[in-house]
């Protein structure tokens, strides 16, 4: 019984030290982009304009097709 307690204690110490020694996870690309946009507000505006420039014409053509169908 004493052996099992010692094994459990060793396992617990190794597990806890592994958790504390684990490296921090790298931030997601979205979080990095958001942090960059907060640092430079104009970069965020450029990203929004890029999305609007590519997505807005597609949305307008989709609405026109739906109106013609129905």
From Swiss-Prot:
> Which tissues and organs express this gene's product?
Expressed by the venom gland.
Which region is the signal sequence?
A: 1-21
Q: Which GO terms describe its molecular function?
A: porin activity; protein kinase inhibitor activity; toxin activity
As stated in the Swiss-Prot or TrEMBL entry, residues carrying the post-translational modification N-formylglycine are: 44
Q: Which GO terms describe its biological process?
A: killing of cells of another organism; monoatomic ion transport
The protein depicted here goes by the name Melittin
Q: Which organism is it from?
A: Polistes hebraeus
Listed A to Z, the keywords are: Amidation, Antimicrobial, Cytolysis, Formylation, Hemolysis, Ion transport, Membrane, Porin, Secreted, Signal, Target cell membrane, Target membrane, Toxin, Transmembrane, Transport
Q: Which InterPro entries match?
A: Melittin/Api_allergen
Q: Which GO terms describe its cellular component?
A: extracellular region; other organism cell membrane; pore complex
* Site residues (Important for the flexibility at the center of the helix, flexibility that is important for the stability of the voltage-gated pore), renumbered to this chain: 57
Subcellular location per the Swiss-Prot or TrEMBL entry: Secreted; Target cell membrane
Q: Which residues carry this modification: Glutamine amide?
A: 69
* Any Pfam family hit: Melittin
Q: Which domain of life is it from?
A: Eukaryota
